[in-house]
Amino acid sequence: EEVRPIIEKLMNRDIYVSANLDKVKSALEDMIPICVFGNYSAGKSTFINALIGCEILPSGGDPVTAKVYQIANADQPDQAVITFEYLNKCIKLYFESDVYRVEAEDSSSDLIQEINEKVSECDKNDMYGKINVALELINNYERKDKDVIVISDVINIKVPFSKNGILGQSRNNFVIFDTPGSNSASNLNHTKVLENALASFSNGIPVWVSQYESIDSQDNAALCDKILQIQALDERFTMIIMNKADCSNLPKNGFDDSKVKEIKEYVAVEKMYSSGIYFVSSIMGLGAKNDGCFQDEFYEDTFSTNKAKYDNPENKFYKTLYKYNIMPDSVRNRIFEMSEECPNKIFANSGLYGVETAMETFASKYAAYNKCQMVYLFLNSVIGDTSKRIDEKTKFLEENKKKRMSELEAAKKDLLDMLVRESQFTVNNLVDNTKTSINEFVNNTLHYDYSLETMETLTSEYRAENASQNNLDIHEHNFEE
């Protein structure tokens, strides 16, 4: 903070340098971002709802996410707040159990009136249901006129995470980012919003959500290329989530080595594979946290229909999705052991338990190191840019100095030449003026009244006197005497 003003002044408020300084500050904070990416229809919103343990984000088959959601765990178990900007003015929506209130400069705006109406009409009495209704309206508000952006791209949400999950019990400060699907043809702002949001990410866990059947698609490969271009988002910690795995035709006894090799060689997977591939059923994982109490009837029906398959080992179609995970053997074996010991069988068998365990491990063991690496990377970038600017300014000053010295030497020569000319002119002028002055003095000031005859007489007297003084004979005689 002390050095920043100096650097910014030196760099003339360079946007790129300021952004990297922001990233340094962000990386030094204790926040652990979980950056969730994926093309629409992959079930990103449902997956994030499962991580949180409640249905707050709108979800469905259509591209529903048009904004970037930044979701943090609330300090109180019965309080939540949504913060965003509308027409560049901050709005906060507070939810406290069954109480809802708004904090805004203009509480009479059309948007707030619509939100108030929707929340009051909400037949879901719980806090999460009202949040879901409010977010759905905010998310869809600009679709009325896609050329007008009146709501900020980032929506900040603080909501209590379920204590039935690892993230909700963790002391680590996890913050989840939900980004728009990048392949939505119905919303032209998706790619732009995604790129703008990713530009500010740092020190996070990249989580790529896809489906087993579409993982080798061109859309996924294109999305991976975008992720790999994000500066300082370390792909070494990327988690690949095969969502809706319970709907996929997976081999009963797991993948053999040849199939694992084939999956790893898919273009998108080959680009992104690092910490592992996780097979997950977000609906079942969410149901394991909320005891099967869903707002969405389809989710409730799905969970109710499949519950026995995840809870009863004697069931003919008993599912353990974590056994399909593809990752280093040491990590895989550890997740196996922990999942088998987990008392919540549905949570473990849905694969979500293994995902959250890996996130907690990253935050507890590797985040501090990663923060140092990120700070080092960003500071190196700032130092490099600053050094480059210093070198440029030094070179400019040196060149300017040489130029000024050359100009001064030329000016000095011109000045000396001018002084010589001026001096000579002054001397000549003085000589001419002196002659003129003497002549004028002699002619006008000195007056001799002797006539010619008088002058001749004086001359004769002078010569006579001079002759007597110069007569050697007289002087010799006087000497002898």
Where are these regions (language model features)?
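A sequence-level detector of short, solvent-exposed, charge-rich linear segments
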Residues: 43-44, 66-71, 189, 195, ...
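A non-catalytic, extended alpha-helical scaffold characteristic of dynamin-superfamily P-loop GTPases
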Residues: 384-481
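Globular "head" domains of long coiled-coil molecular machines
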Residues: 8, 14-15, 20-334, 342-366
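Short acidic/histidine-centered micro-motifs embedded in hydrophobic/aromatic stretches
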Residues: 244, 378, 461
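Short, flexible coil/linker elements and helix-boundary hinge sites characteristic
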Residues: 12-15, 120, 126, 325, ...
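C-terminal helical "lid" subdomain and adjoining coupling/linker elements of P-loop NTPases
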Residues: 330-350, 361-400
